[in-house]
Swiss-Prot record:
Annotated organism of origin: Bos taurus
Lineage: Eukaryota, Metazoa, Chordata, Craniata, Vertebrata
Signal peptide as annotated in the record: 1-25
PROSITE patterns with a match to the protein in the record: CADHERIN_1 (PS00232), CADHERIN_2 (PS50268)
Transmembrane segments: 725-746
Protein name (Swiss-Prot/TrEMBL): Cadherin-2
Pfam families xref list: CADH_Y-type_LIR (PF01049), Cadherin (PF00028), Cadherin_pro (PF08758)
Length: 906
């Protein structure tokens, strides 16, 4: 059997816990038996038990491997067992006879079958110092052997054990490296092994604190340790062969750093501030001071004690305060705290570790400043019994008197701040008292207007007290009282209208000169004989006037409810009343005229413009009516179309949807695109009703499948790009050029045709019939032609030009021609023959005149007609006389022409 030891030179020997399983003397393997393989587990400890310390490992034989057991301790307050059978200490306690024995239970979770085993702990007695030194050379930690399984049976080897932690004091002086323990494996007899340690302090930061001899397994520390930096090191020891193959499972080595008293207590603050009310009873809590120690708080090195070293001043007693030596709470221990005598105390506080041991403990000091706070032990007192003030009537927010008090308490504290109140003489609440925060004076202020004619003087009773009540035991009364006499000064007051505003109800449409009402003001100055005059101050529509003496209001224009100056049927006018006092005063009054509606506005169509498609389906326009009147003079409305012109009802139809809306639709299947003005008759429901023909501008346009207009304006408005617009404009310009070229070509062709027609013999130019143009029923009833229009043919107005349409070949073109010499006017409108002869002479002598005057050619309308065609008028130079007798055969419509040219004598 191997003995496990290990400890630094400065500590008592550390004996490792040793567990040994019993084996048969013959070394044969016994049959598997469910339960604990040992009757008693023993562990030998080198020191008292620490909280969380692993003690030993108990094993439960589970032959079939299917049982799931749960471990319990008979002393759960002291020991606990993990699922793997490791036993730990629940708390720290000195190992004694009552803690040396306990039981461990294992219970099957399914069958509830239960087993138990006893555990015995013993403390190895301390060895003499010489023995320790000798034993150090052989103290070693041996890698444990594991229980192996062979053919379903357990073969017992070395029993598992737990290595107790190694304790090292901090701040050790060496020499370094300082040997701690030797780690070895029992396989070193047959194999060449190499040892190593890993973990923080070895190969992890902070590295190099612990080293191990790879050959001998000797573990050493290389420098002093500091518990305040690292209180525990957790290392793992490894054993491998020369090829680096793991020979043993790693074992855990815990090194605890033992605390030394190397840190003084430190106060959280060097100066502590606290307060205590004056007159406090003994035992009153004041404040708490706190110090901390970096040493182990569970050891004497970190256990602090407090005490008061000094008190200044020492009146009325040198021991006015005491401190709890463990918690640092400062309380009063004597009566007599008086702020008026001592306002502040200064205490020197000391904190000492080692539970306050003055010989071995380290100490530090701090200052505690305790301020004695004031309490209300002095009430405020008025400096006079009566205060005086005066105020003009109708003035508010003015100070009429200052109330002064004295208070012996600390200024600007609740015990010094005064609160004033009026206890009598002001039932209507016309006065108020505010406290000046700087001087503590009471400011008597008027908060409601005071009327001299009602009351000429006020006598107020006021009281003053502090914000907080007086302290108990004070014999003074809690408040002080005084009297305030306020005199009211008479002033000229404003006249006032009553009621204001004044509301009257009138129908709109009243004619000018109608008396509406009388609006007068009253003068509150009853003791003054004053006259009041009235003027108009505001009349937005200039509808009213007021009599300056009696206040009678009369209309000067027609009242209109629909005026923009009328809001919510109410018209507001403001009037001014002025007296002749010194100084003169004035007041305003508002007259509100509620105008009753009459049916004086005809309805109008809304909207005034709309769009519709060329085809009726789907096509409709929803319209409504706008009537500035209100119910019952507005809706419901009646919608209809007028009878004239007939195209309205022929093209359109209107359907009434309800009292406010109607629908306008196309009646025909197709209407050419354009702008149409559709008159709509709208009638309201007034009594009597009022009608109006309102024009709705309808834009008829081509539509897409969705019923939306597709005209160019809409397309451009829809956001066409600049390039698209330029392309469209170019296309339009090209089209216009083509049209112009076509027109030029047509005119040139007309000239060629006219030239050919001039060569036709007049005798052969016989028309078979005469076509009628613009026949609109009946013949020309007015035969009295105005021949005066022939006097100046070249001054005919452009409106007389025949519109573009079917034109005769021999008709003069409409476009501009060169300006020819002006021919003389005929001497008389009736002498048409002389006029024509003079015109022919002028044409013959004019080299620039076109040949239109030589021969007039009319459109050829066929041959073989019994009636001859109209002949042209020949000039005198053309040769021969023209025979107009055939005009008599053309019927009554040409009678005038036959009379003019048929007479040979004329």
């Amino acid at each position: 059997m191997c003995r496990i030891v290990g400890a630094p030179r400065t500590l008592l020997p550390l004996l490792a816990a040793l567990l040994q399983a019993s084996v048969d003397a013959s070394g044969e393997i016994s049959l598997c038996k469910t339960g604990f393989p040992e009757d008693v587990y023993s562990a030998v400890l080198s020191r008292d038990v620490l909280e969380g310390q692993p003690l030993l490992n108990v094993k439960f034989s589970n032959c079939n491997g299917k049982r799931k057991v749960q471990y319990e301790s008979s002393e759960p307050a002291d020991f606990k067992v993990d699922e793997d059978g490791m036993v730990y200490a629940v708390r720290s306690f000195p190992l004694s006879s009552e803690h040396s024995k306990f039981l461990i239970y294992a219970q099957d979770k399914e069958t509830q079958e239960k087993w138990q085993v006893a555990v015995k702990l013993s403390l190895k007695p301390a060895l003499p110092e010489d023995s320790v030194k000798e034993s150090r050379e052989i103290e070693e930690i041996v890698f444990p052997r594991q229980v192996t399984k062979h053919n379903g049976y357990l073969q017992r080897q070395k029993r598992d054990w737990v290595i107790p932690p190694i304790n090292l004091p901090e701040n050790s002086r060496g020499p370094f490296p300082q040997e701690l323990v030797r780690i070895r494996s029992d396989r070193d007899k047959n194999l060449s092994l190499r040892y190593s340690v890993t973990g923080p302090g070895a190969d992890q930061p902070p590295t190099g604190i612990f080293i191990i001899n790879p050959i001998s397994g000797q573990l050493s520390v290389t420098k002093p340790l500091d518990r305040e930096l690292i209180a525990r090191f957790h290392l793992r020891a490894h054993a491998v062969d020369i090829n680096g193959n793991q020979v043993e499972n790693p074992i855990d080595i815990v090194i605890n750093v033992i605390d030394m008293n190397d840190n003084r207590p430190e106060f959280l603050h060097q100066v502590w501030n606290g307060t205590v009310p004056e007159g406090s009873k003994p035992g009153t809590y004041v404040m708490t001071v706190t110090a901390i120690d970096a040493d182990d708080p569970n050891a004497l090195n970190g256990m602090l004690r407090y005490r008061i070293l000094s008190q200044a001043p020492s009146t009325p007693s040198p021991n006015m305060f005491t401190i709890n030596n463990e918690t640092g709470d400062i309380i009063t221990v004597a009566a007599g705290l008086d702020r008026e005598k001592v306002q502040q105390y200064t205490l020197i506080i000391q904190a000492t570790d080692m539970e306050g041991n003055p010989t071995y403990g380290l100490s530090n000091t701090a200052t505690a400043v305790i301020t004695v706070t004031d309490v209300n032990d002095n009430p405020p007192e008025f400096t006079a019994m009566t205060f005086y003030g005066e105020v003009p009537e109708n003035r508010v927010d003015v100070i009429v008197a200052n109330l002064t008090v004295t208070d012996k308490d600390q200024p600007h504290t609740p015990a010094w701040n005064a609160i004033y109140r009026i206890s009598g003489g002001d039932p209507a609440g016309r006065f108020a008292i505010q406290t000046d925060p700087n001087s503590n004076d009471g400011l008597v202020t008027v908060v409601k207007p005071i009327d001299f004619e009602t009351n000429r003087m006020y006598v107020l009773t006021v009281a003053a007290e502090n914000q907080v009540p007086l302290a108990k035991g004070i014999q003074h009364p809690p408040q002080s009282t005084a009297t305030v006499s306020v005199t009211v000064i008479d002033v000229n007051e404003n006249p006032y209208f009553a009621p204001n505003p004044k509301i009257i109800r009138q129908e709109e449409g009243l004619h000018a000169g109608t008396v509406l009402t009388t609006f007068t003001a009253q003068d509150p100055d009853r003791y003054m004989q004053q006259n009041i005059r009235y003027t108009k101050l505001s009349d937005p529509a200039n509808w009213l006037k007021i009599d300056s003496v009696n206040g009678q209001i009369t209309t000067i224009a027609v009242l209109d409810r629909e005026s923009p100056n009328v809001k919510a049927n109410i018209y507001n006018a403001t009037f001014l009343a002025s007296d002749n006092g010194i100084p003169p005063m004035s007041g305003t009054g508002t007259l509100q005229i509620y105008l009753l509606d009459i049916n004086d506005n005809a309805p109008q169509v809304l909207p005034q413009e709309a769009e519709i498609c060329e085809t009726p389906d789907p096509n409709s326009i929803n319209i409504t009516a706008l009537d500035y009147d209100i119910d019952p003079n507005a809706g419901p409305f009646a919608f209809d179309l007028p009878l004239s012109p007939v195209t309205i009802k022929r093209n359109w139809t209107i359907t009434r949807l309800n009292g406010d809306f109607a629908q306008l639709n196309l009646k025909i299947k197709f209407l050419e695109a354009g702008i149409y003005e559709v008159p709509i008759i709208i009638t309201d429901s007034g009594n009597p009703p009022k009608s109006n023909i309102s024009i709705l501008r309808v834009k008829v346009c081509q539509c897409d499948s969705n019923g939306d207009c597709t005209d160019v304006d809409r397309i451009v408005g829809a956001g066409l790009g600049t390039g698209a617009i330029i392309a469209i404009l170019l296309c339009i310009i090209i089209l216009l050029i083509l049209v112009l070229m076509f027109v030029v070509w047509m005119k040139r062709r007309d000239k060629e045709r006219q030239a050919k027609q001039l060569l036709i013999d007049p005798e052969d130019d016989v028309r078979d019939n005469i076509l009628k143009y613009d026949e609109e029923g009946g013949g020309e009833e007015d035969q009295d032609y105005d021949l005066s229009q022939l006097q100046q043919p070249d001054t005919v107005e452009p409106d007389a030009i025949k519109p573009v349409g079917i034109r005769r070949l021999d008709e003069r073109p409409i476009h501009a021609e060169p300006q020819y010499p002006v021919r003389s006017a005929a001497p008389h409108p009736g002498d048409i023959g002389d006029f024509i002869n003079e015109g022919l002479k002028a044409a013959d002598n004019d080299p620039t005149a076109p040949p239109y005057d030589s021969l007039l050619v009319f459109d050829y309308e066929g041959s073989g007609s019994t009636a001859g065609s109209l002949s042209s008028l020949n000039s005198s130079s053309s040769g021969g006389e023209q025979d107009y007798d055939y005009l008599n055969d053309w019927g009554p419509r040409f009678k005038k022409l036959a009379d003019m040219y048929g007479g040979g004598d004329d």
